[in-house]
Swiss-Prot record:
It is found in: Membrane. It is a single-pass membrane protein. Disulfide bonds: none annotated. It comes from Zea mays (Maize). Expressed in roots, developing leaves, the vegetative meristem, and suspension culture cells. GO terms for cellular component: endoplasmic reticulum; membrane. Its cofactor is heme. This is Cytochrome P450 88A1. GO terms for biological process: gibberellin biosynthetic process; pollen tube development. InterPro entries: Cyt_P450, Cyt_P450_B, Cyt_P450_CS, Cyt_P450_sf. PROSITE patterns: CYTOCHROME_P450 (PS00086). Belongs to the cytochrome P450 family. The chain crosses the membrane at residues 1-21. One of its GO terms (molecular function) is heme binding.
Length: 519
């Protein structure tokens, strides 16, 4: 019986081995077939990818002819419809904003100009100071070329969409009331009161606040006062929320479907226009009854303004100008103020030097003078260097848009008539050949340094230089003056990740505690 059992066991073992062998062979065959299928699929994807890119490039460039195509900058159009947008968004959303242009440099060399397909248009990316200067200073060869989706948000009668002659007309009417010496002198007391009361409130709060959120509210309150003569807190908050939503859609893909940032931005634009139209209607009705605002705020000045031909601005022009300026006042000043404060707090030697300058200026003020004057702020040389370095390093406006009106050569490469041009200010500001050790915050690099045209583009260049630059710098200077003399900032998450779209900011909005310090 034992022998029979042993034989049965051997037989069962043999059968098991045969089954295992068959299963192993089948599995190997399946694995080999699957691997081959994956390999074939991968090859097919590569072929399809290359074919789609080549076909898209041919479609966009065929009309140029062989001679003009040969003079194009290096680069590629990428996939149809998408082009370089996925790479652009991936770089910025992954926290590596310089990786987008770096990929062109790595693949095509350091030529300073590259071709791509961005925001639904064939586009040339200009990344050098010399190239940006050439484009920005040539108003005959280049006109404003912002994407249609952006124009729909900011407004067709705003500076980003106006032709040169109309831009010059509107700028002339609005420049003095915004950046003029008398205008800034008039704005200073309100800016000062708003800053000091805000700092006191944050310190009295005792706990942590979202520093960036509070700064944006503060700067928006200032800009609403300047442009609309103020508004109640509920209206100001509603406007501020709408501008926040508007900005999230500015550099998003223009997908007008539920759940996408661009659709929300369009809704925000409609709300803003409705509010501003309501205020404008009230002003015009009051004037019709003989009750004039007397030019006490920017809206009154825009209503009253007329050019040398006696032409007044219409409602659409006034509203789009206000949308543009209010947005700039809401975003730029608040972000730069936050980063300048953070950079100073992180660098005690720089903080001490900036504070010493403010203390020296305070000692020089006559006892008969109440508060600081505009001339006092223009003596703050080191603080100005801090602000310029923050503007360079943070890159609030990292890119600008133009369109070629004729065939133009930049850096020896052709930009065809009708093509879009992106001016990458960020690449200029982060170029080690222009700014050694560019990722370092170093205000001293500005001592005795007058930047060459095209190397510092925080406010643009040429005829379309940002018309509110002096107002923005005044707001930032007033805040830093009071902060340096009486407060300190302790961040809750000092190593917090930075989000770069639509503007660089910590993901926690710089959660921090603000406390008073002794004099």
């Amino acid at each position: 019986m034992l022998g029979v059992g042993m034989a049965a066991a051997v037989l069962l073992g043999a059968v098991a081995l045969l089954l295992a062998d068959a299963a192993a062979r089948r599995a190997h065959w399946w694995y080999r077939e699957a691997a081959e299928a994956v390999l074939v699929g991968a090859v097919a994807l590569v072929v399809v990818d290359a074919a789609a890119r080549r076909a898209h490039g041919w479609y966009r460039e065929a009309a140029l002819g062989a001679a003009r195509r040969a003079r194009l900058p290096p680069g590629e159009m990428g996939w149809p419809l998408v082009g370089g947008m996925w790479a652009f968004l991936r770089a910025f959303k992954s926290g590596k904003p310089d990786a987008f242009i770096a990929s062109f440099v790595r693949r095509f060399g350091r030529t300073g100009v590259y071709r791509s397909f961005m925001f639904s248009s064939p586009t040339v990316l200009v990344t050098t100071a010399e190239g940006c200067k050439q484009v920005l200073m040539d108003d005959d060869a280049f006109v404003t070329g912002w994407p249609k989706a952006t124009v729909a948000l900011v407004g067709p009668r705003s500076f980003v969409a106006m032709p040169y002659d109309e831009h010059r007309r509107i700028r002339k009417l609005t420049a003095a009331p915004i950046n003029g010496f008398d205008a800034l002198t008039g704005y200073l007391p309100f800016i000062d009161r708003t800053v000091t009361s805000s700092l006191r409130a944050w310190a009295d709060h005792g706990g942590s606040v979202e520093f960036l959120t509070e700064l944006r509210r503060m700067t928006f309150k200032i800009i609403v006062q300047i442009f609309l003569g103020g508004a109640d807190q509920a209206t100001t908050r509603a406007l501020e929320r709408s501008y926040t939503e508007l900005n999230y859609g500015m550099r998003a893909m223009a997908i007008n479907l539920p759940g996408f940032a661009y659709r929300g931005a369009l809704r925000a634009r409609r709300r803003l226009v409705a509010v501003l139209q309501g205020v404008l209607d009230e002003r015009r009705a009051a004037r019709a009854k003989g009750v004039s605002g007397g030019g006490v705020d920017m809206m009154d000045r825009l209503i009253e303004a007329q050019d040398e031909r006696g032409r007044h601005l219409d409602d659409d022009e006034i509203i789009d100008v206000l949308v543009m300026y209010l947005n700039a006042g809401h975003e730029s000043s608040g972000h730069i103020t936050m980063w300048a404060t953070v950079f100073l707090q992180e660098n005690p030697d720089m903080f001490a030097r900036a504070k010493a300058e403010q203390e020296a200026i305070m000692r020089s003020i006559p006892s008969s003078q109440r508060g600081l004057t505009l001339r006092d702020f223009r003596k703050m040389e080191y603080l100005s260097q801090v602000i310029d370095e923050t503007l360079r390093l943070v890159n609030i406006s990292f890119v600008s848009f133009r369109q070629a009106t004729r065939d133009v050569f930049v850096n020896g490469y052709l930009i065809p008539k009708g093509w879009k041009v992106q001016l990458w200010y960020r690449s200029v500001h982060m170029d080690p050949q222009v700014y050694p050790d560019p990722t370092k915050f170093d205000p001293s690099r500005w001592e005795g340094h007058s930047p060459r045209a095209g190397t510092f583009l925080a406010f643009g260049l040429g005829a379309r230089l940002c018309p509110g630059n002096d107002l923005a710098k005044l707001e930032i200077s007033v805040f830093l003056h009071h902060f340096l003399l009486g407060y300190k900032l302790a961040r809750t998450n000092p190593r917090c990740r930075v989000r770069y779209l639509p503007h660089p900011r910590p993901v926690d909005n710089c959660l921090a505690k603000i406390t008073r310090v002794g004099s």
